[in-house]
Amino acid sequence: MNLLTYSLLSLSTLFTSTLALPTASQSTPLPPSQDPFYTAPANFSSSAPGTVLRFRIAPGNLTSIIPNCSIAYNIVYRTTNSLYLPSFAVTTLLVPSTPNSSALLSYQIPYNTASVDASPSYTLYTDGPGYPDIPAALGLGWLVNIPDFEGPLASFAAGVEEGHAVLDSIRAVLSLSKQIGFSPSVPYAMWGYSGGSIASEFAAELQVQYAPEMNFAGMAIGGLPVQSLDILTAASGGFFAGLVPSSLLGITAQYPDARNYLISRLKPSGPFNATGFLRAEHFSYADAQTYYENQTIWNYFLNGSSDVLDAPVIQKIIHRDCIMGYHGVPQMPMLVYQAVADELAPIVNTDELVNRYCGVGANILYQRNTIGGHLAEYTNGDEGALEWLEAVLGGTYEGKYKGEGCTVQNVAINVTSSPV
């Protein structure tokens, strides 16, 4: 361990050890852009990644919105952005109603937005009932960590930023074990679908180099957009069209030159103009889906899709920040599940990613569902993912699943009426 690493870890330990259990905060949650809590203190960059910077009981009534939750905390922590510069993020920790929390699940919500005010720590108050996996995990006695992994700039689809933020959220939560009252050696795992799989998968890749001290029990991910170009080319003109402006604004949020270029290529007038495109900066995923549905997003650009897909300044970001499989080999057991007919995230790219990982020793159960599409698989794959996570977090994985190497299964699971 070098002197710089030792100094950062010492500062981190000192800061966390002086944190007292917080009292109740304000009664009404504020949007992150209006809440002073969503800031980092001066000189925070000298602390180690994962250091807790602020800590509070979540405002409002999350415990009455989310079943099986006894208390909720908001945690601001130090992390690292896609440029490998110090940054910060916020996570929400839900504590189960049952005593003696037995495991920690980091649940990456696919919030898919270029607006910081649509981050989970705020939208859980309105959207929480739409995520039944959360009370299910709490009902099993698990702590549930829900990070705002896009960070303070809402860098949607920026995988490196998102992966760092997930890893550091778990570091932050584990450092508070004494204050909150759970074992620091609790087993922990990740779960994410679609946009949540981006953050989870990048965290798994980056863990080897960025957080080598961490030892995950496992990771379940589904609906993987292995390459951002998958979203950009597949979504425009259809149901998911809102993902295109949101992801382009998200991946350029940390790159001012790229953002300025993107804006410069938007049409100044007409039915598809810059004002309409930039509305996505303030839209939640649901708002963007409603506003842009069936629009050909390339109509907003002076020269159509070539202004984006052929632009070196955009391509550089995509290759640096938005393609899975190039930052390390995940070391934990993995469940990967995807619909063969996924219209948003082509399964051929997931096949290739899994094959690459399996070729270098990864432990993966890969389930290819022959029924349904992207939305349907969110539900179709859910029960199996939770069962798999119960095994890895409950210590029964080796007895139920293959502990080494890879298993590829073509399955036919249909528990939803969704046609896509």
Q: Residue ranges of each PLM-predicted region?
A:
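Primarily recognizes the serine-hydrolase "nucleophile elbow" in alpha/beta-hydrolase
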Residues: 171-243
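Short, surface-exposed "cap/lid" segments of acyl-processing enzymes
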Residues: 81-137, 148-150
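Short beta-strand/loop motif that positions the catalytic acidic residue
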Residues: 330, 335-342
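Catalytic-loop region of hydrolases
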Residues: 15-100, 420
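C-terminal catalytic histidine-bearing segment of alpha/beta-hydrolase fold enzymes
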Residues: 306, 310, 315-318, 344, ...
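Cleavable N-terminal signal peptides of Sec/SRP-targeted secreted and luminal proteins
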Residues: 2-20
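Accessory cap/linker subdomain of secreted extracellular hydrolases
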Residues: 222-327
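Alpha/beta-hydrolase active-site loop
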Residues: 132-133, 156-179
